[in-house]
Amino acid sequence: MLYSSGTTAVLPLLYSAVWAAICTALVSLLPQSAARLLGTVIGLLAIVYSLVQAGYYRIFQRFLWLRDLAYLRDGAAFANSLFSYLSVRFFIGAAGMLLLLVLACLMRPRTQPSRARTLYICFGALTAASLVSYQTPANTSYDYSVYQSNGLYQTALYDVSAHFLEPMLCDSDAQQGQARAEVSAYLNTYGSSGSTNAMTGTLRGKNVILVLMESVDDWTITPDSAPTITRLMQDGIQFTNFYTPLYGSARTFNSEFAMNTGIFSPTDGKFVTAYQTNDFSESLPSRFRANGYTANAFHYNRPSFYSRGVMDPAMGYDQYISYMDYTDNPFSDELYEDSFVLTNPALKNKLLPTDQPFFNFVISRNAHMPYGNGDSVGAYAMQKYPQYANRDSCSEVNYYYAKIRLLDDFFAQLLQELEQRDLLQNTVIIGVTDHYAYTMTNQQRVRELSQIDTDLLLERTPCFIWSADMQPMMITKTCNTTDLVPTLLNLFGMDSSGYLGHDIFDSTYTGYAIFSDGSWITDNAVYQHDSVVYQFPQHTTSQTEISAMNALTARYLAANNQILFSNYYHR
């Protein structure tokens, strides 16, 4: 049990021991050779499954769904960094589990136990299980919610049943109809209103460069490490309490999907590409294209990575453009910098056309993990910017800063190219991060640099909107990734109603960030693990407000999945 401590931590171990006794007794009923073979196979599978889940949780703070294996090819590119996240104790534990399995095989008695003895063992184990259940603390509402998403049943048997078998056997048309009705009811009550305000249409007709600033945490943006980004944030609209919650499995693509469509990845174990045939006519690229813009997505990696070659056009982009198609050597040093899209003439002409309005999406990679000399981009960044070598006591932070500076170079060159093409006055630059620095191995140092009061606040990341003629503005309202779509639509004078998120400038929107586990953050409090874990200074939250926010959270999470499942925006 991941969240237990003290005496309650023993109960899950006893429960596991009971099941081990039952399984051992049942296997003992088989003939000697069959029992030995089956016991070994089951033991190996259990050990491998346990180690995979433990390692996955160590890195991502969540358990693995079977559908997550669809990302296996994409994650293989960073496999060389995997072992840096696993402690010595992890490997000692793995070796110990294997040793126990070997000993169990060697020490198995030659004589087969009687059936009566086996039944006694099973009866005793079940009795022990009942006693364990009886001793469970009365206040188990949070534990219950944990058991709904964790454990062998939820991550294996339920995974296969709910995400493979049920979709093939159920009446999907009836379910989709019901889901659409529930989404409509939710959006009519809680969705974006589309009302106008002082910011409506202030950026109408301008070009857009939307930049996903991969892995850029808020504490990394300083005048020293990112002078250009700092200036853009200070001179534009800066959202100081913008949160990027994890939904689904892949943090980067989850945020990428949300900032384009206004919908988070599904939380029910389905892979977001299962919805590639959905109608995303309400996405940002689709809406801008409907208003006469071109829209393309740019990134260094191949189209197969995160299935962007399929998903980006599905979301509304004309095409996904890979930098690798513009170089003879996909491992060339020139691809180490995000600025390649501006130094390559053909790519630059696609990114910054002068003959028609554009909405272009750039996915950066410079600040991506890992952070050390073993990473080619990290070594390149530190060689280019050696002044960061001893900036912090944590070596990871030093490489992180050097890689952030490479990203800052992209923004600096972007401003220069826009000015040279006489596009600067008519182009909006938007910077949004996909997630905080959760991939750093030294998470204690991340907490210290983030200066947070509770861990959920780590999810706060940079977000800004800049235009040359814009008055500087700092927005402190709590907001999240799904709010970006209706906010931008309002700024560009387009209808922003009917979205899961809200126009941040809407005075009736109080602001919140809802997380896939039911946690939430508002301007008043941080709610996690079934209670308010932090109250912001000079703010209070009543029990009535907590109950109302919990009810909203439950409906929000359901509506997010239902929008995708029902293909809600299909006309």
Where is each model-derived feature located?
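Transmembrane and membrane-interface helices of multi-pass
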Residues: 1-162
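Proteins with a high burden of low-complexity, intrinsically disordered sequence enriched in S/T/G/P/A and R
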Residues: 2, 11, 61-64, 128-170, ...
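Generic detector of well-ordered alpha-helical segments enriched in charged/polar residues
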Residues: 11-18, 73-76, 80, 92-96, ...
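A diffuse structural propensity rather than consistent per-protein peaks
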Residues: 53-68, 87-88, 169-179, 252, ...
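Low-complexity, intrinsically disordered regions enriched in charged/polar residues
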Residues: 66-72, 140, 146-159, 163, ...
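Membrane-interface segments at or immediately adjacent to transmembrane helices
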Residues: 78, 132-210
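Solvent-exposed soluble domains appended to multi-pass membrane proteins
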Residues: 185-571
